[in-house]
Amino acid sequence: MLILISPAKTLDYQSPLTTTRYTLPELLDNSQHLIHEARKLTPPQISTLMRISDKLAGINAARFHDWQPDFTPENARQAILAFKGDVYTGLQAETFSEDDFDFAQQHLRMLSGLYGVLRPLDLMQPYRLEMGIRLENARGKDLYQFWGDIITNKLNEALAAQGDNVVINLASDEYFKSVKPKKLNAEIIKPVFLDEKNGKFKIISFYAKKARGLMSRFIIENRLTKPEQLTGFNSEGYFFDEASSSNGELVFKRYEQR
């Protein structure tokens, strides 16, 4: 199984590292093209394009300027330990064993606007470039056109390497849109997480994001290899609802805490 998750806007380059092992991103030539385009933007243009504050725009303009392709442990950090959003709160990769990192390196991929596809131990320099941003480039009007089939092809390589044809889509719609399902050599399973609020079950963004991380951790810790094993997921009160599920969608629910 190949697990797909989104990156995070929040980054952590300060906490102690729990592994010293690392690999290098496989699509850095493409990243360099995007950095070249991003460096043309002024901080006010970045602010408008990304809908972020002037302060954040200044930080990200500096990141684009400082980015350089020779990644080392001194100027970069393993992606799975650098991202710190809601998904990664659930994943808690900082508590992984070396065996967990081994399994994750084979079975987990992070989709990225700048790096395309990241393996957990791939070094990553800090950036902010969300997949949905309309950054014009030599290949088209946005990042979806820039990446084209590249991300899908890289995922197919990972599937072939593990002799498997199942993708667990735990990425957001914004990021999964960078994948071409018809060209992906895989059955796609999408777990959906619903929380009860006022007697009704619905997707609550913060909880759903954290649950995607919890599910990723569940798969990694238990070394799961078959989609049917996912139905045993019960972290933090979630349970599998077979009646609401279908072949491609596994629905998990959690009752409101009273």
UniProtKB/Swiss-Prot annotation:
Pfam family, one: H2O2_YaaD
Coiled coil: none
One cellular-component annotation, GO: cytosol
GO-annotated biological processes: response to hydroperoxide
InterPro entries per UniProt: YaaA
Domain of life: Bacteria
Family classification: Belongs to the UPF0246 family.
Protein name (record): UPF0246 protein YaaA
Lineage summary: Bacteria, Pseudomonadati, Pseudomonadota, Gammaproteobacteria, Enterobacterales
Gene name in the database record: yaaA
